[in-house]
Amino acid sequence: MRSAEEKTVLLCALDDDLEGLKGILERTFTDDAAQSENILWEKDEVGRNALFAACMMGRSAIVRELVQNGAADVNELTARGYSPLHCSAMWGQLDTLKTLVELNADFQAINFRGEKAVDVARRYDKLDCAEYLAWAEAKQNLQAFIQEVRAIVADQEKVQGKLNKEDKNICINTCSAKSDWINNTRTATAQDFIEQKKLLEDVLAPVLLKLNAQPEASMKTRKN
């Protein structure tokens, strides 16, 4: 039988005891590795560890503390493919969903039914959670595309001989404009983000297409 101290992490999650959790985590990381692992990954009678329990119960501060201190993986999956994001969506814990998204939870994780968290929210009629997840995913997709384009332009080896200065400026300026739009538009909807991403893709398509073309010098060499 485990001692009360070994159960503290899970009990803190269940009781929403943030200060107690901070204390046990501080002590745990000074203990030996085996003991620390036992304390951190303890599960309840139905197999839930502290992170999943906190997500289901809406313990947002507990979730943040566990993940930021490396005591839990925000994208951990159960045997049936449920992530913390799935669990919060299923139980209608909107504030905890927002916390998980801030902590870089994966929108694309699917359970054994092939459902993302947004699908689970819809199945359980947690419509506020479904709406938020659709909005957050659309926003993240736009931000990710902007980051991808910026990374491409910054990669001298990739753009050498394919993009000229004007091409690079188009990419940089267009991405900056979209970033400003994201930061300054407080009432953007999921559809707004989807449309802005499509507009960005359309503007940059002619430039990015050049990256897939063979450099002229290379083509001449091959012909010869």
From Swiss-Prot:
The keyword Signal does not apply. It comes from the Eukaryota. Its main location: cytoplasm. GO terms for biological process: cell population proliferation. GO terms for cellular component: cleavage furrow; cytoplasm; Flemming body; midbody. Keywords: ANK repeat, Cytoplasm, Repeat. May play a role during cell division. This is Ankyrin repeat domain-containing protein 45. It comes from Danio rerio (Zebrafish).
